[in-house]
Amino acid sequence: MTRPTSSAPSQRMLRVGEQVRAAITQVLQRGEVRDDIIEATVISISEVRMSPDLKIATAYVTPLGVSDHSIVIEALNRHAKFIRGRLGPQLRQMKYMPEVRFRDDTSFDNYKKIDELLRSPEVSRDLDSDSDSDEK
């Protein structure tokens, strides 16, 4: 008897993802990765999503102050095996050390687009007319 698959991550996947995110952040903050691109860039890790078997960790990163994110993400993926090895001391409780993959985090861009839409004259006009009708 199998359990139906769900698209939502389990509590364990969320907890392990947060632990992996914190461990990757520590590795990058300590400057353990010797790469000119990575050392010169401030990198924000917004989320780490784990596969259901906890063997693959996909880290969503945003390089700050860099116009071309792909260069930084390629550098991180080149050093993914080294970073995976450095996660060991912080994630001793895990049976398998997850393979780390880095992806560009586009959620900040989506938030920016939504904010621009909400501040557009058309939407603000509609919001003003709704508040005027509520007052009557």
From Swiss-Prot:
The keyword Cytoplasm applies. InterPro entries: KH_dom-like_a/b (IPR015946), RbfA (IPR000238), RbfA_dom_sf (IPR023799), Ribosome-bd_factorA_CS (IPR020053). Keywords: Cytoplasm, Ribosome biogenesis. Pfam families: RBFA. GO terms for molecular function: ribosomal small subunit binding. Its main location: cytoplasm. It is found in: Cytoplasm. The keyword Membrane does not apply. GO terms for biological process: maturation of SSU-rRNA. PANTHER family: RIBOSOME-BINDING FACTOR A, CHLOROPLASTIC-RELATED (PTHR33515:SF1). One of several proteins that assist in the late maturation steps of the functional core of the 30S ribosomal subunit. Associates with free 30S ribosomal subunits (but not with 30S subunits that are part of 70S ribosomes or polysomes). Required for efficient processing of 16S rRNA. May interact with the 5'-terminal helix region of 16S rRNA. NCBIfam families: PRK00521.2-5, rbfA. Belongs to the RbfA family. Monomer. Binds 30S ribosomal subunits, but not 50S ribosomal subunits or 70S ribosomes. This is Ribosome-binding factor A.
